[in-house]
Each structure stands twice: as structure tokens, then as C-alpha cells.
Amino acid sequence: MEKRTIVKLPGDGIGKAVLDECIKVLDAAGFNAEYVEGDIGWEFWCKEGNPLPQRTIDLIEKHKIGLFGAITSKPKDDAFNELSLELQKKGLVYSSPIVGLRQHFGLDICLRPCRSYTGNPLNFIRRGQNNSIEEPQVDVAIFRQNTEGLYGGVEWSNPPAQVYDALMTHPKFKKNFGSTPVEEISVSTRIFTKNATERIIRAAFDHAVKFDYKSVTVCEKPNVIRETSGMMYKMAQQIQKADYPQIELWNTNIDAQMMWLTKNPEIYGVIVAGNMFGDIVSDGFAGLIGGLGFACSAQTNPDNGIAIFEPTHGSAPKYADYPVSIVNPIAMIESACMMLEYIDEIEIATKIRKAVAEVVTEGKVRTYDMMKMTGKADVINNGAASTQEMAAAIINKFKA
């Protein structure tokens, strides 16, 4: 097996703990890799005024594949106030380093699969006929456009004259906001491009074909956000009709989708959405399979081969200073499995997933979230497994 070089990006908070344990699992499963660490996150914002240093971008450019832990992100003013006076004088403005990575490398295809593990005590259940308890199997692949939309970062408070003048050419803006003083206005734009929209839609349909899903659902809000959401649904209709007639195309509004996923989640296969709605609906489905401790993701650009794999949870800084790490590493480990599949290490990915499934089903080792505890330092004393113990239990399954 060729030895791979992987850029590890621990980031902030719990990112280091889950990534360290994930790498132990990869090593024990037989993945032959060398890891180089990239600097990213809040520490480097405070030290250097840049949470995504150029040296880290260069590392990823060179090695192509990254495993990412988590980052802390704070509002603009809070971030500015944590800088030294010397850095504050430079007029620096904080921006999320993970968003920066997506935009710099064009990581516009985000896949967030949500699959339930048998025996997970956090799985979604409902009442069926005759008051019976049902636990539907959830297996949904959510494709999120990762670089555009409301997360694109094109926004202003007290917009400059050119922007304000352009907005005033729109009759609805002029009617509803024209009398509002410009200094009282903040604007965040929602920009969709046809090229990026087509790429994410085709990625969703290709995934449905490859893994035998029967439907692709566009989850947007075209009845209100007519231009951007409308463009996505119209383009999906055209693409499905021309190239994927064997796959059903469904359309749901994001608000209705959040209701329906708690009623009949098993009917959905592949879902495709813009940046913000993809973020929302994937967290909704993650709640049905155990929460963010089980939610993984891949962010890829097929054109340049660069890919970043990360759990969808945040850095949870309140847990980072506990004497023993208590967080669930499965989301990070699942993200690594997605990485293995991406680089054609299918056998190792399957081996790890089988071990995770056995540990979850067996139920002997459970982190605090799986035991429905509040995340406090004393959960270990009350029977919850630590991050390290969960990883060790998975590794022990390789030896069985």
C-alpha cells in the first residue's frame, strides 16, 4: 500500500482530542499514512491575526487531503477584541477559516451522510399503529452547495453608496426600505451561480445512481426566494429530465422538510440544497441518528482533487479543558472513513465502520451523549466512556 501524507488540522477546542483518537483508529486498522500538522483556528487568529495562515494553505495545496477537527468562530466584534492592541491597529477582520478553505480551494461539493446505527439509544423513534414503537432506518445523503449563498460572505453594515444606489433600483427595496437611514441597514447577499448549482445537483444525482437511491429531493424555498431557490429547482428539473429519468425528483420547502423529517425520515434518499438550507437540513437529520457525535462530512473539489473531511460539530470549548475528554469521536472517525473511500481505501473504511457498528450495537461502551447525560466533567464517574475509551473499544474490535 502506498504511504499517504495527510494534513491533520486539529483546530480548536475538542478538535485535537477527536482527531488524535481518530488517527489511532486509522493506524490500528492498517492505514499507512504520514501526518503533517497544519496551523488553523482561534489560536492563530489571536497570535497572528489570521486563523488560516498561508503556510497551512500551502500544505493542503501540496498534499491534497486534510482531516479537520473543529474550529471556534465568534462574532466580528468579539473576535476583534481578543486581538492584541498591535494587531487591532491593523484593522483586521475575522473570517471563518473553514469557510476560507472552502472558498480558496473551491470545495463546493459538501456531502453529509446521515445513517442510523442499529442499537444506538439516540436513534429516532415514533409511535405507529396500535401505539406500537417504530424505529425507522435512516439513510440519507445530503449534498450542500458549499461556497455560495448566504455563507458567501458578501455583506455590509451601512452599505457603501454604490451598493445602496444599486439596491434602490429594485422597486421592493425602494418601497420597503427606501426611507430607512442607510446607517441602519445591514445586507447579506444570497448569490447562486449556474455553474456551481449545476455541479451540486449533478453530484447529488450521480450519488443516487452509484448507491441505488431512488430519489433526489431539492430542499429550498422557491415559493418565497424565487430567484435563487427557483433557479436550483428549475435546473434540477432540467437535469433530471435530460440525464437521470430513472431517479425521482422531489421538491420540498425547507420549513416543511424540517417537519417531514421527524415524521417519515426513511422515505428520503438524496437531498440537495444551497449552503444555508443544506446546513440546516443536515443538522436536522443528524438529530435522528444520534446527534452531532455521529455526523460526518466531506468537502471536495473534483477539479483539483483537494478534499477536507470533518465532523459537522463545533469546537465545544467548554469541554476542551476537562481533565479527561468526554466527547464522542465517532463523527470524526466516520469522516475519516469518508476520506478512506475517497482515496480508494475501501477495505479499511469498511473494517472501521464494522467495528463502530459492533461497539454501538453492543452498548457496553457509550459516551455521555449516548447515555443522555449533560456534558459535565463528572460524567466519566457516572459510567460514561471517555473519548479515548470509545476509540479503544473500536480498536479492540479489530483484534476480535
Predicted segment positions?
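Glycine-rich phosphate/diphosphate-binding loop of Rossmann-like nucleotide-binding domains
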Residues: T5-A29, Y164-I254
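Buried hydrophobic positions in well-ordered alpha/beta secondary-structure cores of metabolic enzymes
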Residues: D12-G15, K64, F143, A204, ...
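Flexible, glycine/charged-enriched surface loops at secondary-structure junctions
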Residues: E34-E37, F211-E220, Y244-N251, E345-R353, ...
